[in-house]
Amino acid sequence: SQAYLYQLTKDHYPEVFKEIKQRIAEGRWHAIGSMWVEPDCNIPNGESLVRQVLHGKRFFKNELGVDCDTLWLPDTFGYNWALPQIMKKSGIRYFFTTKLTWNDTNPFRHNTFWWRGIDGSKVLAHIPAVGLEGSITPKDLKKSWDGYHEKQKSPHTIQTFGYGDGGGGPTAEQLETARVLKTMVGLPASTIS
């Protein structure tokens, strides 16, 4: 989700980068992110955040042919109130994070909502009930669905999974488990995407 990591892949592993571009063309890889890196969004000023978006979106468009419309910040600890305005003016319509699920004292009670910025700009935000735990089991799917409070707004939520909390992708075993879970009676309907 970070343009910088794609740049490193292009520079050091050009064959892998070529394969990624092919998967994007096939619709099997969704390049998402919109920023150069996944930054801290509490301390930097607006200009810094604008440049993150400028350089990130430029890379995704020029190198991968993708015009990102989602700001994907699953592991950022806080969010500047100017972000909705910056996103809106940059063609970003959606926001995704998981960090707000970490609060054990004051649980964040919203999953899908319009996030309004300083100037009234708004973007559609989604925060799944389950964060970056990384696993995919019947218990995880049930916890994700049961904790999703906005079913009346949208019948869909996201359950992220992958190898560890550090950006690792799904393992072959996890993908097979997800395929099997799709067929199990009594679990929420699921799709791998």
Q: Language-model segments: which ranges?
A:
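Catalytic-domain carbohydrate-binding cleft regions of carbohydrate-active enzymes
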Residues: 1-193
